[in-house]
Structure formats: C-alpha cells, structure tokens
Amino acid sequence: MKILITGGAGYVGSRLVPNLLELGHSITVLDLMIYGEEVLENHSKLKKIKGDIRNQDLLKKVLPGHDAVLHLACISNDPSFELNPALGKSINYDAFEPLVKISRENNVNRFIYASSSSVYGIKKEKNVTEDMKLEPLTDYSRFKGDCERILNSYKSDDFITTTIRPSTVCGYAKRQRLDLVVNILTNHAFHNREIKVFGGDQLRPNVHINDMVESYLAVLKTSPKKINGEIFNVGFKNQSVNELAVDVKEVIGADVKIINTKSDDNRSYHVSSEKIKEIIGFETKF
C-alpha cells in the first residue's frame, strides 16, 4: 500500500513510519519538519516532503497514486493551540476539508483521521463511548470534532473514512514530546526528584505510543466494510493525575516528592476502548 502521512515526522509519526516501512508499505511523509528530518532514517520506500498541508497546489501534486492518507498533522494540544488561535484554526480546521476533498478527487481509497478523546469534554459516565454527545471545552477540541463531521460527510464505498480518538499518548520516540502528562511527570521526577501536580483529580486516559502505532496498523489491515465511517477510541487506563504521579514515583524512586497545587484546568476524560476491540480485535498491550 502507498500511504501519505501528514505530520509523519512528529511524535507518533516517528514511531509509526518505521513500522509501516518494515511491513513493506511505501510511505510519503508530508511535514513542515520544524524539528528536523533526522527522526526519520532514509529508506528506499520513504519519500520525505517538507511542506505545508495548507498548500493545496502541493497536495494536488503529492496525492496522486496514494492508496491511503493518515492525517496526523496538527497543532497538537490545547496550550499550543492557544498560543496562536488563528494559526491553530488554519492548520487544524481550515486545511482539513481541502485535504479530504483533494484526497478523494485523486482516488485515495482510505482516509484515517487522528482526532482526540478531548472532544467529549467532561462526562459523568464511567465509560465514555463513541456514540455520546461531544461537548468540547476548547477550540482545539471543538475543531477536532468539526473535522470528524466533515470527514464523515465525504465517505463512500470508494472513499473509506475512519476516525481515531486517541487518549493522551506517552512513551519514548525519536521526536520526543515532554508536554504530555506521563512524560512530563516522568521527566520532572527523574531530573528534579519532584513532581508538581496541578489539581490531581482530573482523569487522564493514556495510551503507550507503541499501542497507538499498533492501532493505526490494525485499522489499515481491516476490511473497509468494517471501518467505513467508524470512530474508535484508543486508550489504556483512565487514571487520575494523582494516580499517575504515584505510579511514576514507584518507578523512578521513593525519594521523589509529590507536590499538589490548585488548578483551573478542569478537563477530565474517561473513555471506553471496547468498540475497537469488538470490531477489529485491537487491544492495548503496553
């Protein structure tokens, strides 16, 4: 399969691309490469394009001949989005429908979109499932949900659309991120021997980056009829930030101090990943 991955030089992409190459796929990575290209080693079946997903002329040149698009590129969380909301909207929302439309016009067969579990907002239900109402708390999350609806409107028997709602990813990658909750706590515990927890009761569903990669591989291998127009949560555990801090302390060392402070960040997510298990047989392992 020939696959275009937007944002393929990012955190998840830097782990996903080598796995796809190992399986024999031909990969094109379209990325601004603002963190450099070295996270992706050269390969005979890998083409790296430094470019912007907002450039529609570029998309029209790049997309022909691809079987699938895996859309990872975005301003990737609330704090980053809020630094420049206009830029965030232009990348996360305004560029989305043109990418989908041009993909379909160029006979791309599958389009997989990386959304976010944050689209649910705060829910009282113990297990939040894919059919529940979206109540996003931020523009970042709202635009993620809006893009899901746009993608679904383009689905057909010849254009298979699938949305993944990842939990907060954690773990090591060549293009490492230290702004994700488990990675933040681990970094501070190791280097400072101290963890500052803001709030602490908020639930954060997490998923290891290896499992995140495997979920995309599983979707790509699944029969189109099973996944067309489907939305899947992907997560491992729904733990509070306090519980995560204790887990990190147990791994890093008993001398690590946990300091709790107040927070106005009331984002709290708790998701069920049963649907992806039932439909395509995917379960987290790490």
Task: Name these PLM-found stretches.
Residues 71, 97-137:
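Conserved Rossmann-fold NAD(P)-dependent oxidoreductase catalytic core, especially the SDR/UDP-sugar
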Residues 3-23:
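N-terminal Rossmann NAD(P)H-binding glycine-rich loop of SDR-like oxidoreductase domains
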Residues 44-55:
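Rossmann-fold cofactor-recognition segment
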Residues 192-193, 198-286:
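C-terminal substrate-binding subdomain of Rossmann-fold SDR/epimerase-dehydratase oxidoreductases
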Residues 53-91:
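NAD(P)H-binding glycine-rich loop region in Rossmannoid oxidoreductase-like domains
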Residues 54, 83-98, 134, 138, ...:
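Glycine-rich NAD(P)-binding loop of the Rossmann-fold in SDR/ketoreductase-type enzymes
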Residues 149-204, 209-217, 248-249:
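NAD(P)-dependent short-chain dehydrogenase/reductase
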Residues 78, 113-126, 139-145, 169-173:
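Conserved catalytic-site region of short-chain dehydrogenase/reductase
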